[in-house]
From Swiss-Prot:
Name of the featured protein: RuvB-like helicase 1
Binding site for ATP: G70, P71, P72, G73, T74, G75, K76, T77
Alphabetic keyword roster: Activator, ATP-binding, Cell cycle, Cell division, Chromatin regulator, DNA damage, DNA recombination, DNA repair, Helicase, Hydrolase, Nucleotide-binding, Nucleus, Transcription, Transcription regulation
Pfam families attached to this UniProt entry: TIP49 (PF06068), TIP49_C (PF17856)
Tissue localization of expression: Higher expression occurs in primordia of mesoderm, anterior and posterior midgut and cephalic furrow early in gastrulation, as well as in endoderm and mesoderm lineages during germ band extension. Later in development expression is only maintained in endoderm cells. Expressed in thoracic and abdominal segment neural precursors of all embryonic chordotonal organs.
Known role: Acts as a transcriptional coactivator in Wg signaling caused by altered arm signaling. Pont and rept interfere antagonistically with nuclear arm signaling function, and are required to enhance or reduce arm activity, respectively. Also an essential cofactor for the normal function of Myc; required for cellular proliferation and growth. Proposed core component of the chromatin remodeling Ino80 complex which is involved in transcriptional regulation, DNA replication and probably DNA repair.
Bilayer-crossing regions: none
PANTHER family reported for this sequence: RUVB-RELATED REPTIN AND PONTIN
Length: 456
């Protein structure tokens, strides 16, 4: 006897820096719970983000921008990802970093526009008409070949369909006869035909014929209920960038050069403004007809100070365009020089005319108690066990250096405790890894003391 173990097909995901964030952690009235949904503290910032989520859901925020400003390690990216979690999968969320716009192949403004279009969804409602039932009659109607000769051509196909509620006789196009032959449809089969596309699907043999043969490989299906003619609404979610790409890549020809071109790695090309305008016209027509609905999503640009003056100017135009998403910026800079200039100093490295258009959410440094709670959350997410004094020591290290450094010490400390033959991470393990791995402040202090020993 052979016994096999069935392996799980559930996808295992890597534990990332923000795996523990599940939402904004707000109560029914929109007030922030101190520690909920993976977020700790930052009550004012989370409540402000909650108002933004409500505005996005009610479609009153499109074309506006938000800035998350605060020191490094204060949860700006975590709040942006929490907004994405609150909005759900149906609202497009496109994260990018400021330095992504710089490319040798395409312009900076093109990269920005691509991400803008990725952040705008289109929900298309399509009503599909389906004829479904058991085949009672299948008669191809032949006519003389109009091209002459002795052959005959099929002008149409008469097919009878039966359900539990009634019967219908249909006159179909000859192209559907080819599809019926491919599916090997016979009288007594249960099929459905899509009226819009002419697609035919054989579902199986009607179960009224189940007693015909002893040996049978057929799959028997019950007689369909309801009417023969049914209408079904199908909803598709696409982004405007998907439509741009689909129309920007025409299929190549059948000659050798075209086929060789398809085999080679295609170079990234820009999508023209003319094509985008044509797609916008079609989208607007669909919206006017009620076929489609525009879903403004969220574009999250981290490290916004990495953009230069040209891209900031382009952002003005993009934010004021009729089709624009909600844009969330994040930065950890104070007053600094705007990239692309030599002497223009501005708050957060953003031009003042763009800052004037933004709603700014401030994030504050965490207290020692908040840091301890965040470290506990991370340890729980990573499946690590720590003694209470180890948590206290880590929060002290986080206060003196950074929260990121304290969280990064968790995994090496777990390895150290395994080497020492324990399951729980102790304060001694934390001290050991703290002495082995330097943080940025201690490293820079060491560098300034031994500056003459390093190469210039």
């Amino acid at each position: 006897m052979k016994i096999e173990e069935v392996k799980s097909t559930v996808r295992t995901q890597r534990i990332a820096a923000h795996s523990h964030v599940k939402g904004l952690g707000l109560d029914e009235v929109g007030a922030a719970v101190h520690s909920a949904a993976g977020l700790v503290g930052q009550k004012a910032a989370r409540e402000a983000a909650g108002i933004v989520v409500d505005l996005i859901k009610s479609k009153k925020m499109a074309g506006r921008a938000l800035l998350l400003a605060g020191p490094p390690g204060t949860g700006k990216t975590a709040i942006a990802l929490a907004i994405a979690q609150e909005l759900g999968n149906k609202v497009p969320f496109c994260p990018m970093v400021g330095s992504e716009v710089f490319s040798n192949e395409i312009k900076k403004t093109e990269v920005l526009m691509e991400n803008f279009r990725r952040s705008i969804g289109l929900r298309i409602r399509e009503t599909k008409e389906v004829y479904e039932g058991e085949v009672t009659e299948l008669t191809p109607v032949e006519t003389e070949n109009p091209m002459g000769g002795y052959g005959k051509t099929i002008s149409n196909v008469v097919i009878g369909l039966k359900t539990a509620k009634g019967t219908k006789q249909l006159k179909l196009d000859p192209s559907i006869f080819d599809a019926l032959q491919k599916e090997k449809v016979e009288v007594g089969d249960v099929i459905y035909i899509e009226a819009n596309s002419g697609a035919v699907k054989r579902q199986g043999r009607s179960d009224t014929f189940a007693t015909e043969f002893d040996l049978e490989t057929e799959e028997y299906v019950p007689l369909p209920k309801g009417d023969v003619h049914k209408k079904k609404e199908v909803i598709q979610d696409v982004t405007l960038h998907d439509l741009d790409v689909a129309n920007a890549r025409p299929q190549g020809g059948q000659d050798v050069l075209s086929m060789m071109g398809q085999l080679m790695k295609p170079k990234k090309t820009e999508i023209t403004d003319k094509l985008r305008m044509e797609i916008n016209k079609v989208v607007n027509k669909y919206i006017d007809q009620g076929i489609a609905e525009l879903v403004p999503g969220v574009l999250f640009i981290d490290e916004i100070h990495m953009l230069d003056l040209e891209t900031f100017t382009y952002l003005h135009k993009s934010l004021e365009s009729p089709i624009a998403p909600i844009v969330i910026f994040a930065t950890n800079r104070g007053r600094c020089v705007i990239r692309g200039t030599t002497d223009i100093v501005s708050p957060h490295g953003i031009p003042l005319d763009l800052l004037d258009r933004l709603l700014i959410i401030r994030t504050l440094l965490y207290s020692t108690a908040d840091m301890e709670q965040i470290i506990k959350l991370r340890a729980q997410t990573e499946g690590l066990q720590l003694e209470e004094n180890a948590f206290t020591r880590l929060s002290e290290i986080g206060t003196s250096s950074t929260l990121r450094y304290a969280v990064q010490l968790l995994t090496p400390a777990h390895q150290m405790c395994k080497v020492n033959g324990r399951n729980q991470i102790s304060k001694d393990d934390i001290e050991d890894v703290h002495s082995l791995f330097l943080d940025a402040k201690r490293s820079s202090k060491h560098l300034s003391e031994k500056n003459n020993k390093f190469m210039l």
